[in-house]
From Swiss-Prot:
It is found in: Cell membrane. This is ATP synthase subunit b. Belongs to the ATPase B chain family. The chain crosses the membrane at residues 3-23. GO terms for molecular function: proton-transporting ATP synthase activity, rotational mechanism; proton-transporting ATPase activity, rotational mechanism. It comes from Stenotrophomonas maltophilia (strain K279a). GO terms for cellular component: plasma membrane; proton-transporting ATP synthase complex. HAMAP family: ATP_synth_b_bprime. NCBIfam families: ATP_synt_b, PRK05759.1-2. It is a single-pass membrane protein. The lineage of its organism: Bacteria, Pseudomonadati, Pseudomonadota, Gammaproteobacteria, Lysobacterales.
Length: 156
């Protein structure tokens, strides 16, 4: 065999191989690479969108937590205010009740003192009448001298 013929046959075989690769294998391979690049780009874009969505969701969660804390603090403040109102109302009611009880006790004391004074006046009147009877050695008519005895009792 001739070296030129071998070289020419190899060159033709190589050219045929290049032509087959360029027409049959290269386009599908490039399409597959482009599709893969496109999928990777879409995946990266989806990851970016997901990251943005996550950041937005995190902001919403933080805002909701802030609102919940604010509402909880408001509820706690309202509960404290209500508790203070209840305590103040109970204190005022206790003061009112104590004042009422004190007034009732004072009224009872005054009534008892008045009864004691009245009893004492009656006893003094009776003693005065008895003493006068003994001094005069005669009985004084209580009905006849009642006005005089009442005046004497009121002075005592």
């Amino acid at each position: 065999m001739n070296i030129n013929f071998t070289l020419l046959a190899q060159a033709l075989a190589f050219a045929g191989l290049i032509w087959i690769i360029a027409t049959k294998i290269w386009p599908p391979l490039m399409n597959a690479i482009e599709e893969r690049q496109q999928k990777i780009a879409e995946g990266l874009a989806a990851a970016d969108r997901s990251q943005k969505d996550l950041a937005q969701a995190q902001e919403k969660v933080n805002e909701a937590l802030k609102e919940a804390r604010t509402k909880a603090n408001e509820i706690i403040d309202q509960a404290h205010a209500r508790a203070n109102q209840i305590v103040d109302a109970a204190r005022n009611e206790a003061i009112t009740e104590a004042t009422r009880q004190k007034e009732l006790a004072q009224a009872e004391i005054d009534a008892a003192a008045n009864r004691a004074r009245e009893d004492l006046r009656k006893q003094v009147s009776a003693l005065a009448v008895t003493g006068a009877e003994k001094l005069l050695k005669r009985e004084i008519d209580a009905n006849a001298h009642k006005a005089l005895l009442d005046e004497l009792a009121s002075e005592i």
